[in-house]
Amino acid sequence: MKREECLLVLAGLLARVGFFSYGIYQDAHFAVKYTDIDYHVFHDAARYVAQGNSPYLRDTYRYTPLLSWMLVPNHWLQWVHFGKFIFVLFDLLAGVMVMNLLGKCGRRRKLILASLWLLNPVVITVSTRGNAESVMAFLIMWFLVHLRNRQFALSGFVYGVAIHFKIYPIIYALPISIYIRSSEGSRWFLRLLTMGIATLATLVGCGIGMYYIYGWEFLEHAYIYHFTRTDHRHNFSLWNMLLYLDSSGVVPTTINWAEFAFLPQLFICAAVTYVLWEAPTFQNMQCVLFLQTFAFVTYNKVCTSQYFIWYLLFLPSFLLDTTLSGAKGIFLIFLWVGTQAWWLYNGYLLEFEGKNMFYPRLFSACVTFFLANVYLLAQFILDCRRRNYQTNIKKTN
């Protein structure tokens, strides 16, 4: 890395140390804690692992055992916060690879775009609160770096680990296939087969290994649970009210809506890959991954702040060749932040002041946030299509 890039990474590290230190202070002095409640779940699960037991002895642990293994040093060192440093490390490494994938654009532009991850307060807050999304961010960027370098077996291996860690990256299989089909000439099928076998072998291998150690509870908690998940706390999703009423039994129904909630999002995620057919380049594939992830989070039955990390990871690459004006960009940011703030205000009144805000206030906030994100998605798709049109015009001239 060049000197300016090293300084940016250092600034990102110092910012994270600052947020981390403040978090310890807030935990000790304020009623509202800085540390994510899920981090305590990870920590407790790691204690069971350190004792030679299953992490699934901890109620609400719904993740791969690999995550609990990563936090075992918390108990060796007798310091609950050590695991946050692990997540911060993955966060910074993801930022380095984001910068790497920006390629050879102008120095100033590259630093500004990389700052959208490395100096982003949302990203920094998530990792320093002890959320594990930075591990996923690292794995996704790592497999993309290998894919760009045409290291298909390595890319497939890392991609398989990413899917094992969390299921959602499986939606990237279609744009990856389209990209390889269009960029590898007559050897495209062999390249695709190589990556596919590596991905499947890794995914199945990890699954068999975890099943051998922990049995059915691994499958039940790490995978099956997420298809019928009905969380309604801290949930920005349009499905929030329906899931709340369904889980509370207030409105009796014979239909488990949580099982069908994924159908619209899968349709949208598949549909946006059409944009890649227009210009099947690696850069455009990253834009499509951004569109897919944004759509997936928007239409997901559970949508919390940590899920925003999933698409913010691709934002620097998406904005590399954007046609959006500065004024339009500011408006979109205001729309995203404003509708989110309205939801958070109502959520605060519900959770910390005990007011019944579910209907109509919180419901209307969910609808408003959803519609705002649908509008944002439409603008992003139009932006991609304008770029593809300009690229194709240049090729014909």
From Swiss-Prot:
Pfam families this protein is in? Mannosyl_trans
For the protein in the UniProt heading, the enzyme class is transferase
Ranges annotated as spanning the membrane: 5-25, 79-99, 111-128, 156-176, 193-213, 257-277, 307-327, 330-350, 362-382
Cellular location of this protein?
A: Endoplasmic reticulum membrane
Keywords per UniProt: Cell wall biogenesis/degradation, Endoplasmic reticulum, Glycosyltransferase, GPI-anchor biosynthesis, Membrane, Transferase, Transmembrane, Transmembrane helix
- State a GO cellular component annotated for this protein: glycosylphosphatidylinositol-mannosyltransferase I complex
Q: Could you say which EC number(s) this protein's record lists?
A: 2.4.1.-
Pathway named in the protein's UniProt entry: Glycolipid biosynthesis; glycosylphosphatidylinositol-anchor biosynthesis
Q: Report how it sits in the membrane.
A: Multi-pass membrane protein
GO MF, one term, reads:
alpha-1,4-mannosyltransferase activity
One GO biological process term: GPI anchor biosynthetic process
Please classify the protein's predominant subcellular localization into one broad category: endoplasmic reticulum
Briefly state the protein's biological role: Mannosyltransferase involved in glycosylphosphatidylinositol-anchor biosynthesis. Transfers the first alpha-1,4-mannose to GlcN-acyl-PI during GPI precursor assembly. Required for cell wall integrity.
**Family note:** Belongs to the PIGM family.
What is the protein name given in its UniProt record? Answer: GPI mannosyltransferase 1
Query: Which species does this protein come from?
Result: Eremothecium gossypii (strain ATCC 10895 / CBS 109.51 / FGSC 9923 / NRRL Y-1056) (Yeast)
Please state the gene responsible for encoding this protein.
Answer: GPI14
